[in-house]
Regions:
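Acidic-basic catalytic patches of nuclease active cores, encompassing PD-(D/E)XK
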Residues: 1-36
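Nucleic-acid nuclease catalytic cores
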Residues: 44-52, 59-97
Length: 97
């Protein structure tokens, strides 16, 4: 059985958020999911800090609010909490791996 990729989660969840997947910015970077209100970065739980930085950049570039979706195992609860402490203005969502 093949392990799901990050893009599989984006494809499964972004449409339910009312978003467009892989939205390309002028500098050719890609927002994982651009909704009418948020620039959403999906990433693996342990990469929470990178997700925070990308969400902030994409939000600034699009005029949307920043959000991250962390793909986590049950025992990785410390990572979403770190993201919330480090960046309290970013919406942090968690989905199971």
């Amino acid at each position: 059985m093949t392990r799901p990729m990050e893009a599989d989660y984006v494809g499964a969840y972004c449409p339910h958020m009312g978003g467009k997947t892989e939205y390309v910015l002028e500098d050719r970077t890609r927002v994982d999911c651009l909704t009418p209100t948020h620039a959403v970065e999906f990433d693996w739980c342990h990469k929470w800090a990178e997700a925070v930085g990308q969400a902030l950049y994409y939000a600034r570039s699009t005029g949307r609010m920043p959000a991250i979706v962390l793909i986590c195992e049950p025992e990785e609860g410390r990572f979403p909490e770190r993201a919330r402490v480090a960046a309290p203005d970013i919406e942090v969502m968690v989905i199971p791996k």
